[in-house]
């Protein structure tokens, strides 16, 4: 559905006509990229049939000897809390539990992660050029509590990984983690009223894995949104004979350098290809271009690239303007979010003042408190889309004009322009990427939305032209967290069975999302998950994690205090249905994605497919979010917790 070409008086204005023409251009560009297989055009790296490619998913950073030297977790061990994930989300759970007085004993917490250490996405991703794309003062968790001062406005990958270890050290979590481990099943035992987990712990090459059965009173799911690298199903890809790797598992043995040394000297004299032009490639491409003899950038959909403005942290500014009072980091998160949700008040201080704060139309996918609920009628949705397109137009045109001003070759510049609304793909920021295409050794291979046609032993094929390569880099992203309707079980990659052996995934597939506040589901007592569906999201994922973990831990704390410890906490079916109905009322807002190009946000277009099945339509609506933005969601949760009643939960003593 496109915004209407008619103005308020009924006659189209010049701006209305321009917006209508733009929406038609967007629609045409999106149509080029739709593929009937949707998510099926990709496969998880660890599930690729070819053994050589499947091995690319293995952990290149793990120190097996050091981990094997630690005292092993005993089979049959029981914990108060088992947290699945040891990235920033899992660490926030552990810290919040400790600060609430819920986890002071040696067997109170166990964090389980497939990685070889703390850090989550910052453990796995160590590619050259890696930085967080959100300001580090707002993104890096617990800065106020640790007293750490980031080195620059946008922290580099090694610093982000180091910060995870800083948190683990300060809260003494090093001996409360089980790494290299995959949880296969989580099953509720009605008799013991405990969760039973089947876990496989890897021990490294030549070592037999350990099969463990663990028990927990509470299970907290902290799986991230960038955890499962995917690769496109390009015919013949497995026949390519040169080195190949995914950006999420960078191979410095091939490129030279290291995570802290971006001198990729082994690329000298090499023809390098990189597939993908998303948020990762924006950072990687300039680094590859410095050393490769020839660099070929294979593009399906260009990214909109805005200015970055990286700079070192000024100690005086930090003390006087940033960390100036208690609660400064939450305030800064809220301030950034207000600009992205079109909620900034006239004259308010712009604390972050970067490219993110110049795109209020991003509210199209995260919500805004400014406009209320959008009625799901054709007229109201068209009006809503028209307002969003109008809001986005100045910024979108500036982004495209910036491309023209930087890229010297007009044909290349035209191919690098993003013809879709700002909110359809993760916005990117760089003061190097576009400039790279002015270098004589860098070649843009635009596939006009089709993607790479095929691969052979010596390179890639696009539009019947072969591009010989020595090395191939896959910057092809991650499995969308909304796969499986956003089921926490699918997202975590674990089979979860609640009361009576009921499968959490089956519940999602049959009825759609069913939660209270997006964090727990009836039939699965003492199981909580980080908000995704039926909650709210922020461009700054650390804000989402901060709000979600705070709420979950406070709910548990209140329940434990009520029964003097050993609580059983379960949302009622009535409460989750009432919450699901509330979520469905907000679905009209997210019609904003109807004009989007296929990608991560739209599940490669699957979220845009029309359905006449009322059940399917209801399931989709239930899987949405609140449309007023993260600040409104946070306030709702705070008000909910304020009276201490925990309305909608059944709370009893487990004993």
UniProtKB/Swiss-Prot annotation:
Record note on pH: Optimum pH is 6.5 to 9.0.
For binding FAD, which residues are annotated in this chain's numbering? 89, 113-114, 121, 124, 132-133, 139, 183, 492, 541
Task: Tell me the InterPro entries matching this sequence.
Answer: FAD-binding_Monooxygenases, FAD/NAD-bd_sf, FAD/NAD-binding_dom
Q: Which residues bind NADPH?
A: 277, 280, 301, 425, 452, 600
Cofactor(s) needed for function: FAD
Q: Which Pfam families match?
A: Pyr_redox_2
User: What Gene3D superfamilies has UniProt attached to this entry?
Assistant: FAD/NAD(P)-binding domain
Task: Give yes or no: UniProt keyword Zinc-finger.
Answer: no
Q: Disulfide connectivity?
A: 424-596
- Known uses: The polycyclic ketone monooxygenase accepts bulky and complex substrates and converts them with high efficiency, making it a promising candidate for application as an industrial biocatalyst.
Q: Which keywords does the record carry?
A: Disulfide bond, FAD, Flavoprotein, NADP, Nucleotide-binding, Oxidoreductase
* Temperature-dependence annotation: Optimum temperature is 50 degrees Celsius.
Q: Give the EC number(s) under which this enzyme is classified.
A: 1.14.13.-
Which GO terms fall under molecular function for this chain's record? nucleotide binding; oxidoreductase activity
> Which family does the record claim for this protein?
Belongs to the FAD-binding monooxygenase family.
The free-text function statement in the UniProt record for this protein reads: Polycyclic ketone monooxygenase (PockeMO) that displays excellent enantioselectivity, acts on various ketones, and is particularly active on polycyclic molecules. Breaks C-C bonds through the insertion of a single oxygen atom adjacent to a carbonyl moiety, yielding esters or lactones from ketones. PockeMO is able to convert linear ketones (including cyclohexane and to a lesser extend 4-octanone), cyclic ketones (including cyclohexanone and cyclooctanone), bicyclic ketones and polycyclic ketones (steroids). Performs oxidation of the keto functionalities at both the A and D rings of steroids.
Q: What is this protein called?
A: Polycyclic ketone monooxygenase
Q: What is the species of this protein?
A: Thermothelomyces thermophilus (strain ATCC 42464 / BCRC 31852 / DSM 1799) (Sporotrichum thermophile)
Q: What is the lineage of its organism?
A: Eukaryota, Fungi, Dikarya, Ascomycota, Pezizomycotina
